[in-house]
Amino acid sequence: MFLGSHAPRLDDKGRLTLPAKFRDELEGGLVITKGQERCLYVFPMAEFTRISESLRTVPVTAKALRDYSRVFFSSAADDVPDRQGRITVPAPLRSYAGLMRDCVVNGANTRIEIWDAQRWQAYLESQEESFAELSEEVLPGVI
């Protein structure tokens, strides 16, 4: 499980150092792809495989699935962190997420999200008021 928020910097080669506590789950490889709200999703290879298999069960005649799958899979790149825990974020994905230098890496349960630091701050500020309301809708009786 991935938890917490971290603030690494993207280097000149497009590499990002992942938090040490995330590395064990990713040593078998990972997939990075477009996420929602212009962030990037990073999945351990096993989790990405599980998602892929789940999507395979939906009929290809479902237009929404075709549309989503085209973007999700065509933008995906696999990688293995190096000895320093760095991954290379491909240029098209850096562009999509607006990643320049300062980033935020968030644990999001079964995935990691990579955000441009300013975009993440703006997102947090826009969601602060609705956070309590959303918990009642999304997590009734859980918390």
Swiss-Prot record:
Subunit architecture: Forms oligomers.
Keywords linked to the UniProt accession: Cytoplasm, DNA-binding, Repeat, Transcription, Transcription regulation
GO cellular component term of the entry, any: cytoplasm
Gene3D superfamilies associated with the record: Transcriptional regulator MraZ domain
Compartments it resides in: Cytoplasm, Nucleoid
Residue ranges crossing the lipid bilayer per the database entry: none
Pfam family, one: MraZ
GO biological process: negative regulation of DNA-templated transcription initiation
GO molecular function: DNA-binding transcription factor activity; transcription cis-regulatory region binding
Protein name: Transcriptional regulator MraZ
Organism the protein comes from: Frankia casuarinae (strain DSM 45818 / CECT 9043 / HFP020203 / CcI3)
Primary localisation category: cytoplasm
Domain of life (superkingdom): Bacteria
SUPFAM superfamilies referenced in this protein's UniProt entry, alphabetically: AbrB/MazE/MraZ-like
Domain called SpoVT-AbrB: residue spans: 5-47, 76-119
Similarity-based family: Belongs to the MraZ family.
Source organism phylogeny: Bacteria, Bacillati, Actinomycetota, Actinomycetes, Frankiales
